[in-house]
């Protein structure tokens, strides 16, 4: 009878407390009085936690994927101004995905943001229809993000200046080589109080040397600009598969105050979704550098994948690449923080994701298998989109050459030589090998 009672008690406890009472844990089962006291404390603790945090399933989540979110962040934002109006500049694969995320949040937090989100579209014909009209009637970007339903409060606009009219927050999400032309058109039409976030990956080379794209926006438009970057393949985010990202933003000197201006809490509400978790930090330089240079490393991973060299070679490329990313940041942007590269989604996590798939790996793999050039591969594979590593490796080479430091970054230089000077991919190991043997 004793054995039966113990088994029954174990079975009951396993069902009610499966984590605490495994068969191994049952060997040190607490007494009945201890168990009751512990259960009472757990119940009281749970009641206190639920009193402070209202957790509910989000309406966009599928029933079989019950991601939950906390509304506690909303309660601490008390707006002392009109709701923020948001415009997304760019409507490609990633631009449309971010616009979807933002539009879901502006509708959800309509006391913080104006629900309608404008998305500037470089208009083009899809058959006999304009892409803008298709987005606004069918609520899908059939060219760059097909089969993904977009919120009805997301409005496509082919007129750049009209799309930003009255906007308080601009989100740049275009191929970075087009940024100078876009900024030139915006000059004189953006008020000083406007804030911006750059989702672009790359650098601007000019009279000021190598420059972060967020800094370029600030200098050219006179507005504060942060950055967003992370381990985010657009199709997965668009399908609401769980992922995380990093937003970096520094409060400007003309910050208007809590509840009157964009800050970390506002940005969290703008970008955070149940399927898209956001961490907001100050290190704009760190996440921008990592976001740009990971695409160069991804090209190298694509080369070795296309040659069939396997996972060991890819891992070696990623190790060397991470080292050169950190070195580049410390050398040219000393304000960047080393911990950003390994603590944030925008760092090593983004590097791993990008080197495992995405446009740059796809293009480089195709180059290795077919012998075609980078631009030919990009044109044939990407449906009008860009592999940013192709341009970034040239920008990095030009800057390092100006500084006479190309030998300090052998992986970046090797990628440039393969892409632009037709150096044999098979020579990659010799080009990046670190020799510690002294000549005698």
From Swiss-Prot:
Positions modified as Phosphoserine?
A: 70, 72, 75
Subcellular locations according to the entry: Cytoplasm; Mitochondrion
Q: Which GO terms describe its cellular component?
A: cytosol; mitochondrion; nucleus
BP GO terms, sorted: glycerol metabolic process; glycerol-3-phosphate catabolic process; glycerol-3-phosphate metabolic process
EC numbers, comma separated:
1.1.1.8
- Output the PROSITE patterns linked to this UniProt entry: NAD_G3PDH
Q: Where does NAD(+) bind?
A: 90-95, 122, 178, 234, 359, 388
Q: Which reaction does it catalyse?
A: sn-glycerol 3-phosphate + NAD(+) = dihydroxyacetone phosphate + NADH + H(+)
Q: Which residues form the active site?
A: 294 (proton acceptor)
What family does this belong to? Belongs to the NAD-dependent glycerol-3-phosphate dehydrogenase family.
**Protein name per Swiss-Prot or TrEMBL:** Glycerol-3-phosphate dehydrogenase [NAD(+)] 2, mitochondrial
Its gene is: GPD2
């Amino acid at each position: 009878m004793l054995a039966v009672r113990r088994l029954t008690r174990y079975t009951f406890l396993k069902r009610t407390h499966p984590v605490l009472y495994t068969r191994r844990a049952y060997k040190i089962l607490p007494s009945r009085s201890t168990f009751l006291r512990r259960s009472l404390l757990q119940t009281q603790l749970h009641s206190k936690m639920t009193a402070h945090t209202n957790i509910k399933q989000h309406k966009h989540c599928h029933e079989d994927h019950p991601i939950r979110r906390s509304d506690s962040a909303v309660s601490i934002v008390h707006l002392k101004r009109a709701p923020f109006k948001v415009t997304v500049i760019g409507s490609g694969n990633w631009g449309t995905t971010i616009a979807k995320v933002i539009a879901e949040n502006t509708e959800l937090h309509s006391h913080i943001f104006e629900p309608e989100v404008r998305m500037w579209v470089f208009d083009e014909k899809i058959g006999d229809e304009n892409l803008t009209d298709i987005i606004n009637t069918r609520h899908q970007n059939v060219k760059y993000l097909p089969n993904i339903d977009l919120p009805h409060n997301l409005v496509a606009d082919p007129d750049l200046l009209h799309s930003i009219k009255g906007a308080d927050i601009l989100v740049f999400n275009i191929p970075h080589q087009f940024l100078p032309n876009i900024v030139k058109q915006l000059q004189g039409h953006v008020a000083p109080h406007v804030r911006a976030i750059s989702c672009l990956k790359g650098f601007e080379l000019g009279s000021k040397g190598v420059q972060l794209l967020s800094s370029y926006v600030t200098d050219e438009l006179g507005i504060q600009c942060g950055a967003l970057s992370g381990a985010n393949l657009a199709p997965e985010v668009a399908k609401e598969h769980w992922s995380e990202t990093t937003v970096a933003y520094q409060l400007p000197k003309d910050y208007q105050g809590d509840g009157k201006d964009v800050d970390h809490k506002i940005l969290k509400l703008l970008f955070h979704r149940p399927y898209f978790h956001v961490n907001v930090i100050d290190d704009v330089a760190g996440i921008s550098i990592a976001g740009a240079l990971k695409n160069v490393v991804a090209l190298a991973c694509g080369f070795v994948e296309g040659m069939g060299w396997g996972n060991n070679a890819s891992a070696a490329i990623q190790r060397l690449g991470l080292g050169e990313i950190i070195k580049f940041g410390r050398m040219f942007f000393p304000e960047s923080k080393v911990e950003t590269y390994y603590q944030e989604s925008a760092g090593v996590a983004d590097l791993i994701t990008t080197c495992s798939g995405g446009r740059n790996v796809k293009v480089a793999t195709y180059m290795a298998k077919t012998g075609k050039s980078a631009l030919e591969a990009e044109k044939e594979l990407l449906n009008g989109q860009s592999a940013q590593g192709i341009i970034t490796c040239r920008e990095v080479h030009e800057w390092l050459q100006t500084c006479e430091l190309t030998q300090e970054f052998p992986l970046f230089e090797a990628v440039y030589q393969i892409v632009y000077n037709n150096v044999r991919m098979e020579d990659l190991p010799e080009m990046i090998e670190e020799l510690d043997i002294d000549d005698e």
